[in-house]
Amino acid sequence: MPHRRALDARAHRTAVAEALAVAGLSSLALRTIGSLSGGERQRAKIARAVCQTPKLLVLDEPTNHLDPRARGDLLSLVARLGITVIAVLHDLTLIEDFASHVALIDDGRLAAYGHPQEVLSGARVRETFEVDMHRLPHPFEDRLLCALDIPISRPINRPVSRTGPRPVPSR
């Protein structure tokens, strides 16, 4: 970890003001944390992170508390600053807009990696998980196929019981 530089009070206030301005949050400078909405808190945390001008930023569900406009602002901010971001996202509709590359993780293992359109296509998901429409799928496969709106020929909103090992993703 690089050493953080110590700032005097004036430099600290200036850095905070600049970070809030970059994130479009200048109006929040004098408010307490308790008075901020969830989305404002989320954006303030991101502003705090980017004011250190990192080369890499790891974001865990960065858009959870953001409305659609604020999500767009966040994507624009990250793109404008040119920071490399590793983002943990479960909102599959956001992934295509946010990511240049996608790693699909299943049970802690890398299941697929590539460009969003390629990884999130129905054919790639079926190939990756060797989805057989005549067997009961693993619950992860069901959730993924539903989230990606991939048409399937069987009902999936029923309890799934499974015997045997989980399918091994192809490489």
Predicted feature locations:
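Conserved ABC ATPase signature
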Residues: 32-36, 40
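A short, surface-exposed alpha-helical micro-motif characterized by mixed small hydrophobic
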Residues: 95-97
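ABC ATPase nucleotide-binding domains
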Residues: 121-171
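Conserved catalytic motifs of ABC-family nucleotide-binding domains
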Residues: 53
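Catalytic Walker B motif of ABC-type/P-loop ATPase nucleotide-binding domains
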Residues: 57-61
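Conserved ABC ATPase "signature" region
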Residues: 10-28
